[in-house]
Amino acid sequence: CRFGDPECQTIMPLMDTNFVNILYKCASGNLNGDEELLSSSKVSACVIASSKGYPENYNVGYPITFNNDESEDIQVFHSGTSINKEGIVLSNGGRVLSVVCQGNDFDSAFNLVYKVLGDINFEGIYFRRDIGHQVRKNFSDGDH
């Protein structure tokens, strides 16, 4: 089993179960089928911040600034980043960051994602603005 990103990064913050214990039981042959996978009543949204030109030609080595608030409903996963000798986070790949946020509905989750993305800066940052339009259109409050 492979837990891909951004899929796993989007789902894991919603889990209220000790997932490591369930994986350990599975790997050791002790999964008995009555384990509960509890999840939050919130929804989760993810948008990738990539380098301009990805997936073709893109430049790396640009300093990244993070000006966003901290919250348990915000996770920023580093994919294509590195840290230089001075401790500065740099862009170091095509898919640079995954910004994942939770909310009570898809609109609030995606609005928070785009707010956080607006507070992250590096030269050539690019992110799609049409992510999630399908669920935002098809799900109303309480339908998730």
List the model feature ranges, each with a label.
Residues 1-73, 84:
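Active-site "cap" helix and flanking loop/linker of ATP-utilizing ligase/carboxylase catalytic domains
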Residues 48-50, 79, 102:
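Generic beta-strand/beta-sheet core signal
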